[in-house]
Amino acid sequence: MGALTESQAALVKSSWEEFNANIPKHTHRFFILVLEIAPAAKDLFSFLKGTSEVPQNNPELQAHAGKVFKLVYEAAIQLQVTGVVVTDATLKNLGSVHVSKGVADAHFPVVKEAILKTIKEVVGAKWSEELNSAWTIAYDELAIVIKKEMNDAA
């Protein structure tokens, strides 16, 4: 289990706020990165099926990516406050939705890499190993909970 320090949680919070400052741009970039890393992942998203490229200003895409980043941010705060990511109704539901959509364990490193690259681009010169580590810990701990819920739902 990976608790976060107050400093690490603050880094995640400030970079998440920068991400939120331009949701259309950053969510679009996130999905471009996901598909660069794993082109076949396109079929997992209803809003990407039948498209040749990642659509600009797509409300479903923005909402989905926004939720992903918000969940990681919330995981970071939980890790700083309690030392664990708490399983709640949202994460339980997420587990069963991911199973129904065909998400597999192998998809999690793809999302993690795209999140880290997106945040690195968002913060620019403020990127640091500590920021990378904080997002990594938060994502990894969140992924453990989601994977458990996926296994329970399967």
From Swiss-Prot:
Transmembrane segments: none annotated. It holds the Pfam family Globin. Keywords: Cytoplasm, Heme, Iron, Metal-binding, Nitration, Nitrogen fixation, Nodulation, Nucleus, Oxygen transport, Phosphoprotein, Transport. Residues 3-151 form the Globin domain. Nitrated in effective nodules and particularly in hypoxic conditions; this mechanism may play a protective role in the symbiosis by buffering toxic peroxynitrite NO(2)(-). Nitration level decrease during nodule senescence. Phosphorylation at Ser-46 disrupts the molecular environment of its porphyrin ring oxygen binding pocket, thus leading to a reduced oxygen consumption and to the delivery of oxygen O(2) to symbiosomes. The modification Phosphoserine is found at S46. GO terms for biological process: nodulation; response to nitrate. Belongs to the plant globin family. This is Leghemoglobin-2. It comes from Lupinus luteus (European yellow lupine).
